[in-house]
Amino acid sequence: MRFLLQIGWIARNFVYRVLKVRTRGAKAMVFTGKGELLLIRNSYGATHLFVLPGGGIGRRETPEDAAAREVREETGLEVRELRFVGCFANDGEGKRDTIHLFTARADGEPKIDAFEIAEAGFFALDALPDSVSGATRRRIAEYCSGAEPAGRW
């Protein structure tokens, strides 16, 4: 079944490249009370990389609602204290994407369905996995240093 998910992801990205699709997405940097950060590893695409939870914004959905929904769908966690960080342009995956990034808080352990998400967990900022994506590392560094967010993902 994951094979079909991977094929679908490849086909979707091909269509994005051909049609130059514009999309909107939302991601969240979700922290525990101890300051640990939630990271996920998808079961499609770059399956070896840890990234922030997130996904597309629905037609009648706010970016905040989309970020909370994506965290809930991908990890089973309910977020609180959702705060806007910034918007980023992203032309990865062949599309022209605007990513809305938020910080949030959550308690509990992530529960994944093991279909879309291969792995999820909270990590101390000084003990992140080696396989964190470059864009995710940049967002973490900006957050930790208090720097203004870059305009590109």
Regions found by a protein language model. Name each.
Residues 1-27:
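Acidic, metal-coordinating catalytic segment for phosphate/diphosphate chemistry
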Residues 20-22, 31, 94:
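A short catalytic or substrate-binding loop motif that flags glycine-/basic-rich loops and adjacent residues
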Residues 57-80, 86-144, 149-153:
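Unchanged
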